[in-house]
Amino acid sequence: MIGIVSYGSYVPKFRIRVEEIARVWGEDAKKIKDGLGVHEKSVPGMDEDAATIAVEAAREAIRRAGINPEEIGAVFVGSESHPYAVKPTATIVGEALGVGNDYFAADLEFACKAGTAGMQICYSMVKAGMIKYGLAIGADTSQARPGDALEYAAAAGGAAFIIGENPIAEVEATYSFTSDTPDFWRRDLQPYPSHGGRFTGLPAYFRHVISAAKGLMEKYGYKVEDFDYAVFHMPNAKFPVRAAKMLGFSMEHISQGLVVKAIGNTYSGSSLLGLAATLDVAEPDERILLVSFGSGAGSDAFAIRVTDAIENYPREPKVWEKIERKAYVDYAIYLKHRRKIKA
């Protein structure tokens, strides 16, 4: 039995409200909140980046698992905002965690689904007998052009998952759906991404998320009724709710993992933070459907069954408790923290 042995999460404490961003740009905050379903977003501190977020989440996962870091045989960090263009984040994380030198490391990029790609690779390496434990992380300090619609939701945060045998949650099955879809992109040397506006919806997000979820269920014989929870990538709060309804899930299935309302879209950390929040309350034999999405475009779907081992697993502090620990900043401080003001 292979799956999630442990998990950890990290959410920066700083927040900025939609009203504050809208005030600066002279826009209607209520209309934006109604349209996105997002009320505020997380903001990284000046000394925080994807690497520090990854380290914090991974440290929690290792502490909870009670394992020796040197037992980890692979480290994968998925992100759109790696600190270096040339120099892996994964080696920074491995060094900070004390993994040693005898491990495989790689950075992954696939927009917002790079973290789940890491989970699939770790799962495969454990299953093949190559490693005892694999560490898959999704972490981002996502960028948005000032004044762009993305600015209201592009946030920071991440989650880490240790994959191995004797898990607290078994990965029963996984399935991916991929295409070449130019819905969101950023060229080299460009500081901010471009996007296709409404094109990011039906042809991109919904096509891939729905196809991956249906593909998983059809290939492995699952039905909606087999799942107690569902977690979808959260670019905003509207898309995952609509995707859930399209597949036949209710709000009860997705509400626990719908963290986007309170912290925005953490990109590579989005669906993984939702999964972590769901594992915080899940009981033995409950099943979770996880579906990520990455622009460009692709989705990874997982059927995850919680095991009896979860009962003795230390889940405090929980994701929602971390979300509630916050301090608000105004737009000027936000720009300073995001280093958008150049001296």
From Swiss-Prot:
Q: What does the entry list as the binding residues for CoA?
A: 198, 238
Report the domain of life of the source organism. Archaea
Q: Does the keyword Transmembrane apply?
A: no
In which pathway does this enzyme or protein participate?
Metabolic intermediate biosynthesis; (R)-mevalonate biosynthesis; (R)-mevalonate from acetyl-CoA: step 2/3
Quaternary structure and partners: Interacts with acetoacetyl-CoA thiolase that catalyzes the precedent step in the pathway and with a DUF35 protein. The acetoacetyl-CoA thiolase/HMG-CoA synthase complex channels the intermediate via a fused CoA-binding site, which allows for efficient coupling of the endergonic thiolase reaction with the exergonic HMGCS reaction.
Q: What HAMAP family does UniProt report for this protein, alphabetically?
A: HMG_CoA_synth_arch
Q: What is this protein called?
A: Hydroxymethylglutaryl-CoA synthase
Provenance organism = Archaeoglobus fulgidus (strain ATCC 49558 / DSM 4304 / JCM 9628 / NBRC 100126 / VC-16)
